[in-house]
């Protein structure tokens, strides 16, 4: 036995040199099965991935024949053996595996289970990390092979020789220029996270932006409510041309001391009571034009009208606020200032109505939106004494849903338009409650003959 043969027998199986095969033969890599080497067509894969994979197989054949000097029979035996060992010892991978990988695709460097496309090659996590660390820390100049660079690299032997493993990474096509240093890697990771967050925001905005618009049934309901409002709204859209300003001297001379420190100008109060009766009548007519309202018992109709009348009249006045003259137009005909309305009997309630008018001026409400607001106020199921509470609540829900869908259809440019508009319902309910309290005091302070009968009928309990 020669010294060389004795030395060779002492080497591990993976470090033994093999006879040089016929260079014209195409040889397989150790550790890769027939199924892996003869994969199905990659037509369904990305074009770039197909080209890279084809290149990788050509490089593998060159590596096997020129570097490893393997015997063809040896290669076949080791391939089958390694594949069987791999299948026996394989553990189920619970990590993320990209969809572009074939089932059980193997690393082109060591034959372990691949986890993705890393640095232009399909590799396992181990070879990806080894290649990255080698480049980032410039370790390859310090690598050396004890066996003249002829080591076989598979998933068992890959940690035995760093030089041969790195050489194989290069030969199969792993790109050194794609490895980033720590600062660039952190910057890339930050950019990826920012892009993910951006996509999340865009998807959220897209889902929020997709808002339903009225159905055919809701359009019919909207049409009915709008027509009811237009038919009972004095002067319609021509109110500015037809309004008359209350003389400035009226409402400036308080005569009666009202509760809570307020003062009442009886002349102004007399003017307001003259227009209050037709204003109440129009609210009643509006309600009677709604089929849902007419289906309710008469007792419930009366309770709903008494509860919402001041709220609807206040809304109709508020949407006719004129910022230029700083006035509200009552019943479509009488323009009054804040002071005149306050001294005319409403006191602090007038401030709430004017403030509402100022805030609504930026909403640019159309007749349909005003009409639907009135319908929501009318169908308030929490009025004391109602019998058909559930039915009224159902009616209000129908109006609210149609209202919201109509707002989506209108596409207002005010931020959070719908919730802000719903808050105005709360403001109007507060105005109604404050007016009820104010009315009780006014009955005591003002002469009874100044109150119109319909006014007393609606606002008295």
UniProtKB/Swiss-Prot annotation:
Residues 107-181 bind DNA. Zn(2+) 1 binds at residues 107, 110, 124, 127. A zinc finger (NR C4-type) spans 107-127, 145-169. 3,3',5-triiodo-L-thyronine binds at residues 282, 331. Residues 1-106 are annotated as: Modulating. Zn(2+) 2 binds at residues 145, 151, 161, 164. One of its GO terms (molecular function) is identical protein binding. Residues 1-24 are annotated as: Disordered. One of its GO terms (biological process) is regulation of transcription by RNA polymerase II. Residues 217-461 form the NR LBD domain. One of its GO terms (cellular component) is RNA polymerase II transcription regulator complex. 3,3',5-triiodo-L-thyronine 1 binds at residue 435. It is found in: Nucleus. L-thyroxine binds at residues 282, 331, 435. Keywords: DNA-binding, Metal-binding, Nucleus, Receptor, Transcription, Transcription regulation, Zinc, Zinc-finger. Disulfide bonds: none annotated. Residues 244-461 are annotated as: Interaction with NR2F6. Residues 13-24 have a biased composition (Basic and acidic residues). Binds DNA as a dimer; homodimer and heterodimer with RXRA. Interacts with the coactivators NCOA1/SRC1, NCOA2/GRIP1, NCOA7 and MED1/TRAP220 in a ligand-inducible manner. Interacts with the corepressor NCOR1 in absence of ligand. Interacts with C1D. Interacts with NR2F6; the interaction impairs the binding of the THRB homodimer and THRB:RXRB heterodimer to T3 response elements. Interacts with PRMT2 and THRSP. Interacts with TACC1; this interaction is decreased in the presence of thyroid hormone T3. Composed of three domains: a modulating N-terminal domain, a DNA-binding domain and a C-terminal ligand-binding domain. Belongs to the nuclear hormone receptor family. NR1 subfamily. Nuclear hormone receptor that can act as a repressor or activator of transcription. High affinity receptor for thyroid hormones, including triiodothyronine and thyroxine. This is Thyroid hormone receptor beta. It comes from Rattus norvegicus (Rat).
């Amino acid at each position: 036995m020669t010294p060389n043969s004795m030395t060779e027998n002492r080497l591990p199986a993976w470090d033994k040199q093999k006879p040089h095969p016929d260079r014209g033969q195409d040889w397989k890599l150790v550790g890769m099965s027939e199924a892996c080497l003869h994969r199905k067509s990659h037509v369904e894969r990305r074009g770039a991935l197909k080209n890279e994979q084809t290149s990788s197989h050509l490089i593998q054949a060159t590596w096997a024949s020129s570097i490893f000097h393997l015997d063809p029979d040896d290669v076949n035996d080791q391939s089958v053996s390694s594949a069987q060992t791999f299948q026996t010892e394989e553990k189920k991978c619970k990590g993320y595996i990209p969809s572009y990988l074939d089932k059980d695709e193997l690393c082109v460097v060591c034959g372990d289970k691949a986890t993705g496309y890393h640095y232009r090659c399909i590799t396992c996590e181990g070879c990806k990390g080894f290649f990255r660390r080698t480049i980032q820390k410039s370790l390859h100049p310090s690598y050396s092979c004890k066996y003249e660079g002829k080591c076989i690299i598979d998933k068992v032997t890959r940690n035995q020789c760093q030089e041969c493993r790195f050489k194989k990474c290069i030969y199969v096509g792993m790109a050194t220029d794609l490895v980033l240093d720590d600062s660039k890697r952190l910057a890339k990771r930050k950019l990826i996270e920012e892009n993910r967050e951006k996509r999340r925001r865009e998807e959220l905005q897209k889902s929020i932006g997709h808002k339903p618009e009225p159905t055919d049934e809701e359009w019919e309901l909207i049409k009915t409510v709008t027509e009811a409002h237009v038919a009972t709204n004095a002067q319609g859209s021509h109110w500015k041309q037809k309004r008359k300003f209350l003389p400035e001297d009226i409402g400036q001379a308080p005569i009666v001391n009202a509760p809570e420190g307020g003062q009442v100008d009886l002349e102004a109060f007399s003017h307001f009571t003259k227009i209050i009766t037709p204003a109440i009548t129009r609210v009643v007519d509006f309600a009677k034009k709604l089929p849902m309202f007419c289906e309710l018992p008469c007792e419930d109709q009366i309770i709903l009208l008494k509860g919402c009348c001041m709220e609807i009249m206040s809304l109709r006045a508020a949407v006719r606020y004129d910022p230029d003259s700083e006035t509200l137009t009552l019943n479509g005909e009488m323009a009054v200032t804040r002071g005149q309305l306050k001294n005319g009997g409403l006191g602090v309630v007038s401030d709430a109505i004017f403030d509402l008018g100022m805030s609504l001026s930026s909403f640019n409400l159309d007749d349909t939106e005003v009409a639907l607001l009135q319908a929501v106020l009318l169908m308030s199921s929490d009025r004391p004494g109602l019998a058909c509470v559930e039915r009224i609540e159902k009616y209000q829900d129908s109006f609210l849903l149609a209202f919201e869908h109509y707002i989506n259809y209108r596409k207002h440019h005010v931020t959070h338009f719908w919730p802000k508009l719903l808050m105005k319902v709360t403001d109007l309910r507060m105005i109604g409650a404050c007016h009820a309290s104010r009315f009780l005091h006014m009955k005591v302070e003002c002469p009874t003959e100044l109150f119109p009968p319909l006014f007393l009928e609606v606002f008295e309990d």
